[in-house]
C-alpha cells in the first residue's frame, strides 16, 4: 500500500497518494505499430494489445516497466514514448548526481525513496557494470548565518538514515576540497555521479529481454474506453482501454501507468482525472568549467539550501567525462521542453498563467525570481556566486553549457509541491490508471525504489 491516502475531489473522484509530508540502442521499428521495438514480448494475439501500458520512456517509466515485468512475467507490458529515442528529456538533461537523501523532510516519500533508491542504484550499476563514481559531496556554509541551517540539515540527514554524514570544519574542508573556502560543511561521502541516460537504457534492455515491448514515436493524445467493432469484440472485452496517439493509431490495454514527466498533468486529464497539481516548467542553465581549471573541483560542492525553495542552488558537479558543471539556476521556461531562453509555446505559457498558481508564486518570491533571471542573463552574476566557494574562479574560466527543464508541480495557491505525488482515481477509466504526478529530483536516484512502490500498488489496485 502507498503510505498515506489523501482524498482530493476532482473530475473522477481522484484519490491522491502521498506521504503527509556504453549506450544500448534498441532495434529499429517493426511493422504494425509505429516505432515498435521488439523484445520477444509476451503480447496478446494482437500486436497492439497489452495487459499494462506505461506512458513515458524516461527513467521512472522504464524502471517501473522493468520491475513490473520481472514481478509479473506472465503479463504483456508495453511502454509508449513520444520521442524517437528513450530518456531524452529530464533523464537526459540532469546533473547526474546520485543523491544521498539528506535534503528531504523526514518521513516524506522523497526521504524514504531517495535513501532506498541510492542503495539500489549503486547495487544495479555494480551488477551491470555501469560506470559511476562515489565522489562524495560537501554542503558548505560560507556565512556565519548559514551555520544553524547547516546543522539543522545535518540532523535531518541523520533522521533520514543517510550513511556516513559528518560535520567538518575549515581544515577538513581544505583536505577534501583544497580550493574551497567555507566555515563549516556537511561531508556526504555516499553521494555519487552516474549517467542516468545510460542507466535508463539499461532498464529498457532488461525490460525487453524479459519480454516487454517499447513503442517509440507514439505521442499519447487520448486514453478512452475502447469502442467496439465486430473484428475486435474479443479485444474489447479483454482490453477495454484504448490509448491513442497523435497520428490516429491506438493500442488496447487493461491498465495504464503514466510516468509522463513534463506532461503528467495533461496525461492525467486525458484519462478523466484531476489535472491538479499543474506542472510548471523551470529551466536550469549550466556553465562548464574550462578543462584547464578542472583541478579546482574534486567532488560535488553545494551551498546550504534555502528551505523556501525546492531548488538546491548553484553548485559544482563533476561529470564522468571529466568536465565540471556549474549551476543550475532556476527560471521559468516558456515551453515545456524549452531548453533555450527564447523557446516559446503559447499553450504552455497560457496554462502556466491561467491554470496554475504561478502568479501567486511570483508575488510570494518576487525578489528570488528576479535574481534568478538576472543570473541567467549575466554570466558575471553566477560567477560572483561561485566565487563565494572557490575564489580562484574567474569569468574567463567558464563557458555556457547545457540546460535542463524540471517539471515542478504547483498547486492553485502558488505553493511548490515538495514531495513526490502519485495519483489513483475512481471511475470507468480512472480505476484502471495510476499516475506519477510529481517526480522531480531526486526521482532519478529514487527510480528503482519508486518502481517497487508502483509495482506493489499496481498489484493491489489492479489485482494482478
UniProtKB/Swiss-Prot annotation:
Pfam families documented for this protein: DAO (PF01266)
The reaction(s) this protein catalyses: (S)-2-hydroxyglutarate + A = 2-oxoglutarate + AH2
UniProt keyword Plastid, yes or no: no
Superkingdom of the source species: Eukaryota
Biological process per Gene Ontology, one example term: small molecule metabolic process
GO CC annotation, single: mitochondrion
Positions of modified residues (N6-acetyllysine): 105, 174
Protein family membership: Belongs to the L2HGDH family.
InterPro entries in the record: FAD-dep_OxRdtase, FAD/NAD-bd_sf
Record's keyword terms, sorted: Acetylation, FAD, Flavoprotein, Mitochondrion, Oxidoreductase, Transit peptide
MF terms in GO: 2-hydroxyglutarate dehydrogenase activity
Entry protein name: L-2-hydroxyglutarate dehydrogenase, mitochondrial
Provenance organism: Mus musculus
Amino acid at each position: 500500500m502507498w503510505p498515506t491516502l489523501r482524498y482530493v475531489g476532482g473530475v473522477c473522484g481522484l484519490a491522491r497518494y502521498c506521504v503527509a509530508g556504453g549506450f544500448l540502442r534498441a532495434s529499429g521499428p517493426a511493422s504494425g505499430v509505429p516505432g515498435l521495438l521488439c523484445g520477444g514480448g509476451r503480447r496478446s494475439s494482437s500486436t497492439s494489445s497489452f495487459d499494462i501500458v506505461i506512458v513515458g520512456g524516461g527513467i521512472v517509466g522504464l524502471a517501473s516497466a522493468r520491475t513490473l515485468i520481472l514481478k509479473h512475467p506472465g503479463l504483456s507490458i508495453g511502454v509508449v514514448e513520444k520521442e524517437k529515442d528513450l530518456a531524452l528529456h529530464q533523464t537526459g538533461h540532469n546533473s547526474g548526481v546520485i543523491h544521498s537523501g539528506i535534503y528531504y523532510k523526514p518521513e516524506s516519500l522523497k526521504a524514504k525513496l531517495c535513501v532506498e533508491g541510492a542503495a539500489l542504484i549503486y547495487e544495479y550499476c555494480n551488477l551491470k557494470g555501469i560506470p559511476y563514481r562515489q565522489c562524495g559531496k560537501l554542503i558548505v556554509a560560507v556565512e556565519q548565518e548559514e551555520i544553524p541551517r547547516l546543522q539543522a540539515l545535518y540532523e535531518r540527514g541523520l533522521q533520514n538514515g543517510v550513511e556516513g554524514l559528518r560535520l567538518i570544519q575549515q581544515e577538513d574542508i581544505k583536505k577534501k576540497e583544497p580550493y574551497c573556502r567555507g566555515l563549516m560543511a556537511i561531508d556526504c561521502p555516499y553521494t555519487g555521479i552516474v549517467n542516468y541516460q545510460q542507466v535508463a537504457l539499461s532498464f529498457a534492455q532488461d525490460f525487453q529481454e524479459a519480454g516487454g515491448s517499447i513503442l517509440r514515436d507514439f505521442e499519447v493524445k487520448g486514453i478512452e474506453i475502447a469502442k467496439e467493432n465486430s473484428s475486435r469484440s474479443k479485444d474489447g472485452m479483454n482490453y477495454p482501454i484504448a490509448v491513442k496517439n497523435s497520428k490516429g493509431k491506438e493500442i488496447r490495454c487493461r491498465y495504464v501507468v503514466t510516468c509522463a514527466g513534463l506532461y503528467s498533468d495533461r496525461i492525467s486529464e486525458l484519462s478523466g482525472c484531476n489535472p491538479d497539481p499543474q506542472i510548471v516548467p523551470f529551466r536550469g542553465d549550466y556553465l562548464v568549467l574550462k578543462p584547464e581549471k578542472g583541478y579546482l573541483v574534486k567532488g560535488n560542492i553545494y551551498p546550504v539550501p534555502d528551505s523556501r525553495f525546492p531548488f538546491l542552488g548553484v553548485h559544482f558537479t563533476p561529470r564522468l567525462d571529466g568536465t565540471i558543471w556549474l549551476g543550475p539556476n532556476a527560471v521559468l521556461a516558456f515551453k515545456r521542453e524549452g531548453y533555450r531562453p527564447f523557446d516559446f509555446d503559447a499553450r504552455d505559457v497560457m496554462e502556466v498563467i491561467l491554470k496554475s498558481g504561478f502568479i501567486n508564486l511570483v508575488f510570494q518570491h518576487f525578489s528570488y525570481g528576479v535574481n534568478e533571471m538576472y543570473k541567467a542573463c549575466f554570466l558575471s552574476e553566477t560567477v560572483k556566486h561561485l566565487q563565494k566557494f572557490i575564489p580562484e574562479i574567474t569569468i574567463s574560466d567558464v563557458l555556457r553549457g547545457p540546460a535542463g527543464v524540471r517539471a515542478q508541480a504547483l498547486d492553485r495557491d502558488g505553493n511548490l509541491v515538495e514531495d513526490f505525488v502519485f495519483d489513483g482515481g475512481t471511475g470507468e477509466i480512472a480505476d484502471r490508471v495510476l499516475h506519477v504526478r510529481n517526480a522531480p529530483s531526486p526521482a532519478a536516484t529514487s527510480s528503482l525504489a519508486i518502481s517497487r512502490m508502483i509495482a506493489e500498488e499496481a498489484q493491489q489496485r489492479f489485482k494482478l
